[in-house]
């Protein structure tokens, strides 16, 4: 089964593949992820999903933090008097838009690449991403002298594609509407002997992402609530593990776009739901579903899931650009939008909000702000 030649830089759906449940290499091991409806998780007995994988713990996050200490930025925590007055709370923004490559993704990417064997590092890695994980893997690979190949949708923001190439990665574009990225990535990995580092469903990725919340909770003691955006659930699950370990009474709420609400539905029904190619400006949240690792972690550690509208995302972007003077992308403001738009109402509370990234095309921002 070969969907394309090794050096072909465009892709179309392989007609030989008539299903989506392929084996995917995760850190050198093969498993069979579920991309379909109907995966039920029993929270009380931990049956099914979690038993097949390494269960990520706070110890893993602490280990990742030590490995990242001199590599990743310890990003700033910002406050706003206007936001505090508007919400009648103390709000603390953890600004991962100031992280290397412009998003939290660098934390997990570097941590995951460090764990590879010498042979895996020599052969190289491959991943699929809408842009932020792509840049993170590309930079981490460059720093560690590991060849990187990135499968990116052709509608990903230009700034993300350009930066990924700039970090030295080979970029392969595909059409979201015609190609299953997991299948394309798997085929390339098999042809070239590469190790797949998925964008969220990987224990070392989750552990690395959790270091952002670890820093926030350690810096701002006594948080009552932590708001985190959710795409595939890597940042959300890692953040929840860290928050519950350091501040057990802190509630953790994940936030998605209304148009990409697979995780919210999965959380409330305890059944894994899929939304393919959701039409949302939050490109980092266009993942079809939570993963086999992140789904049970979200169920175990997260207290609630909510959604925000496209209009709320744009208004929040504008507000943060105008008042905090920071560049933020649509996905990056999901958590903030839930608070500022009143989806979450927690007066007299200490609230942490993770701003996940700031990689956005200026032309896109101009169009969004003008149209709103």
Stretch-by-stretch model annotation:
Residues 5-8, 21, 31, 65, ...:
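N-terminal hydrophobic alpha-helix used for membrane targeting or insertion
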Residues 17-20, 30, 44, 117, ...:
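Hydrophobic alpha-helical membrane context
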Residues 1-27, 35-50:
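Short, low-complexity, charge-dense intrinsically disordered segments
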Residues 50-372:
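PLP-dependent amino-acid enzyme catalytic core
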């Amino acid at each position: 089964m070969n969907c394309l030649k090794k050096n072909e830089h465009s892709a179309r759906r392989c007609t030989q593949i008539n299903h989506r449940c392929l084996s995917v290499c995760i850190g050198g091991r093969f498993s069979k992820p579920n991309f379909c409806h109907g995966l039920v998780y029993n929270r009380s007995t931990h049956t099914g999903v979690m038993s097949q994988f390494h269960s990520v713990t706070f110890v893993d996050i602490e280990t990742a933090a030590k490995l990242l200490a001199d590599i990743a930025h310890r990003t700033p925590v910002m406050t706003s008097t206007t936001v505090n007055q508007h919400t009648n709370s103390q709000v603390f923004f953890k600004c991962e838009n100031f992280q290397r490559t412009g998003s939290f993704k660098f934390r997990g990417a570097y941590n995951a690449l460090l764990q590879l064997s010498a042979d895996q590092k020599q052969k190289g890695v491959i991943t699929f991403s809408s842009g932020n994980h792509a840049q993170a893997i590309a930079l981490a690979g460059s720093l560690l002298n590991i060849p990187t190949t990135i499968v990116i949708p052709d509608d990903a923001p230009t700034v993300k594609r350009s930066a990924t190439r700039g970090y030295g990665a080979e970029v392969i574009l595909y059409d979201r509407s015609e190609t299953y990225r997991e299948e394309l990535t798997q085929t390339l990995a098999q042809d070239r002997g590469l190790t797949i580092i998925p964008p969220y469903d990987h224990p070392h990725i989750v552990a690395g992402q959790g270091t952002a919340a670890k820093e926030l909770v350690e810096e701002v003691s006594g948080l009552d609530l932590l708001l985190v955006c959710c795409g595939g659930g890597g940042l959300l699950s890692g953040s929840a593990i860290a928050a519950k370990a350091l501040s057990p009474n802190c509630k953790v709420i994940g936030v998605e776009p209304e148009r990409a609400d697979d995780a919210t539905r999965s959380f409330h029904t305890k059944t894994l739901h899929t939304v393919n190619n959701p039409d949302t400006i939050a490109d980092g949240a266009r993942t079809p579903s939570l993963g086999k690792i992140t789904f049970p972690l979200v169920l175990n550690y997260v207290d609630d899931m909510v959604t925000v509208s496209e209009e709320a995302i744009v208004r929040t972007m504008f507000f943060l650009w105008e008042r905090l003077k920071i560049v933020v992308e649509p996905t990056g403001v999901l958590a903030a939008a839930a608070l500022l738009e009143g989806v979450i109402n927690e007066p007299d509370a200490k609230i942490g909000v993770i701003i996940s990234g700031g990689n956005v095309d200026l032309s896109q921002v101009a169009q969004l702000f003008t149209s709103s």
